[in-house]
């Protein structure tokens, strides 16, 4: 697959301009197509211009200049679901694979199972802190850059591959972050076990360190794959990542019994199976991305990388603020004893698992809003905003109804202890009743990212996390789990209030969306 190192040929009379998003520092680079041996700009006339062939990855992003307001949300709703459903399936694939891994490792022994649990917790914490911010920033930046490229396609020569510096920048940063994570996790495994308070004489200690050191080799492909997923999301394509994730997870499920039991590698085999599957996922995503985009563009600039780091830094701070209330809730629940903690864990796991569906709506909101906003199609952007909020509210309400009916039988799958089950069922109102609020809060996250409103997303999360954590510290000693669950509901409700306030005040990047006239066609 030979790379075609040609980009778009814009009018030489145009000056470089910012993307339609005034909050983004990404600038459009004007590069005229030229012969490899001739550095002079190519001259394109209507008679010379070859017939354009639609690119299946990007043709859907071209603006519809004949766009007319949809009287309902039918068309937008269908587009939202076409993005959200594959994304939800991809998000659900990893937890399902974790259950498969747990089942296989559990047949080795309880100490090994506990060791893997500790190691996976450490690995996932690092992943959430550094990898998820890169994923979200990549999605927004690629969507913006691709939207501008699609907007100017009428003034350009269509090439077989797109040159999008945001894709190249994210992949290079991902490789660097992945290597750094691998080194830190491998060399720091002993220190990290100390942080997790695993004593040296614990039967978990040695297998936990061994598993973490092997899993560290999978850090680079994980980060690179997430960056590639962000690029595909920027193209509004969540189906390709789904195929890649499913292929990798199927391979993992096949390799687990072979490496663990047949070859006798134990938990080392479980780690190796996971790492191999992660490299397969990264390979598939890069292979498919390379068919349409130049992966390593010579146009990578320091300023662009700095913008990634700045926005990513804000989202790392936001992730920390997000983790604090949940960590505190677990700590406070554990102080009530093992039975209370077990009931709380069932409630929390179901609550978080259901959130995958609404988190997929946030992905759709981010991709669609970033595209329309960057193109200056503000009327269409407003339709996307209202449409995704309506779909989010409908989804949350539907999930609430389903959970009210099914929470009891679903909870019984996790335990046969009547006392634990009784405690879990006392959280039905919290799990089911909070779903509409959760759905809207997650959708608002996607809307923030769609207009690169990373600063407000980060700072508001710090304030919301502080208030809800303080509430739990005061309420938990008196009201027990009810106080903890109320604090978590408050956390989500305040996120919704903050988002509604941001939209209502029409400040920051939202000012342009509400006040700017529609671009002339």
UniProtKB/Swiss-Prot annotation:
Tell me the protein's name.
Protein DETOXIFICATION 44, chloroplastic
Q: Where is this region: Disordered?
A: 12-73
Q: Where is the transit peptide, renumbered to this chain? A: 1-31
Lineage summary: Eukaryota, Viridiplantae, Streptophyta, Embryophyta, Tracheophyta
The keyword Membrane is annotated on this UniProt entry: yes
The membrane spanning regions, by residue number, are 80-100, 103-123, 167-187, 213-235, 242-262, 268-288, 314-334, 345-365, 385-405, 423-443, 454-474, 481-503
**Does the keyword section mention Transit peptide?**
yes
Q: From the Swiss-Prot or TrEMBL record, what is one GO molecular function term?
A: xenobiotic transmembrane transporter activity
Organism in which the protein naturally occurs: Arabidopsis thaliana (Mouse-ear cress)
**What is the membrane topology listed in the Swiss-Prot or TrEMBL record?**
Multi-pass membrane protein
Q: Which family does it belong to?
A: Belongs to the multi antimicrobial extrusion (MATE) (TC 2.A.66.1) family.
| InterPro entries documented for this protein | DinF-like (IPR044644), MATE_fam (IPR002528)
GO cellular component terms, semicolon-separated: chloroplast membrane
Q: Per UniProt, which keywords does this protein have? A: Chloroplast, Membrane, Plastid, Transit peptide, Transmembrane, Transmembrane helix, Transport
As for subcellular location, the record says: Plastid, Chloroplast membrane
């Amino acid at each position: 697959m030979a790379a075609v190192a040609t980009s778009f040929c814009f009018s030489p009379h145009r000056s470089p301009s910012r993307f339609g998003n005034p909050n983004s520092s990404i600038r459009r680079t004007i590069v005229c197509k030229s012969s490899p041996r001739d550095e002079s700009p190519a001259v394109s006339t209507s008679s010379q211009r070859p017939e354009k062939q639609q690119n299946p990855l990007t043709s859907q992003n071209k603006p519809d200049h004949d766009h007319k307001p949809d009287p309902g949300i039918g068309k937008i709703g269908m587009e939202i679901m076409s993005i959200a459903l594959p994304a939800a399936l991809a998000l659900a694939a990893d937890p399902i694979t974790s259950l498969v891994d747990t089942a296989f490792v559990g047949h080795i022994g309880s100490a090994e199972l506990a060791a893997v649990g500790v190691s996976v917790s450490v690995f996932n914490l690092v992943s959430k802190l550094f990898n998820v911010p890169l994923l979200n920033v990549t999605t927004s930046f690629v969507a913006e850059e691709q939207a501008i490229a699609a907007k100017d396609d009428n003034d350009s020569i269509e090439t077989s591959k797109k040159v999008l510096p945001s894709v190249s920048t994210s992949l290079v940063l991902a490789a660097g972050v992945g290597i750094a994570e691998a080194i830190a996790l491998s060399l720091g495994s002993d220190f990290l076990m100390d942080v997790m308070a695993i004593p040296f004489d614990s039967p978990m200690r040695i297998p936990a360190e061994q598993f973490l050191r092997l899993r560290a080799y999978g850090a680079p492909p994980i980060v690179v794959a997430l960056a590639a997923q962000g690029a595909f999301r920027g193209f509004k394509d969540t189906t390709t990542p789904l195929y890649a994730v499913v292929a990798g997870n199927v391979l993992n499920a096949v390799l687990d019994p072979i490496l663990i039991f047949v070859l006798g590698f134990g938990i080392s085999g479980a780690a190796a199976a996971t790492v191999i599957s992660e490299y397969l996922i990264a390979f598939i995503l890069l292979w498919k991305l390379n068919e349409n985009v130049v992966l390593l563009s010579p146009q990578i600039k320091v300023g662009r990388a700095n913008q990634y780091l700045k926005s990513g830094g804000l989202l790392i701070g936001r992730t920390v603020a997000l983790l604090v209330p949940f960590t505190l809730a677990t700590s406070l629940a554990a102080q009530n004893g093992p039975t209370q903690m077990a009931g709380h864990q069932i409630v929390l796991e179901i609550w978080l698992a259901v959130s995958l569906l609404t988190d997929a709506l946030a992905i759709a909101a981010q991709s669609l809003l970033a595209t329309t906003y960057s193109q200056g199609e503000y009327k269409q952007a407003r339709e996307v905003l209202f449409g995704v909020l309506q779909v989010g509210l409908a989804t949350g309400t539907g999930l609430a109804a389903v959970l009210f009916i099914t929470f009891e039988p679903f909870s019984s799958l996790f335990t046969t202890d009547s006392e634990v089950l009784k405690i879990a069922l006392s959280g039905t109102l919290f799990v089911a009743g909070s779903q509409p609020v959760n759905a809207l809060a997650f959708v608002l996250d996607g809307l923030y990212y769609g207009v690169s409103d990373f600063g407000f997303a980060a700072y508001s999360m710090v304030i919301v996390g502080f208030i809800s954590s303080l509430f739990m510290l005061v309420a938990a000693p008196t009201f027990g789990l009810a106080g903890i669950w109320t604090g978590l509901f408050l956390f989500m409700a305040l996120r919704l209030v903050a988002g509604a306030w941001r939209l209502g005040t029409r400040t920051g990047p939202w000012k342009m969306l509400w006040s700017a006239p529609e671009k002339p066609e």
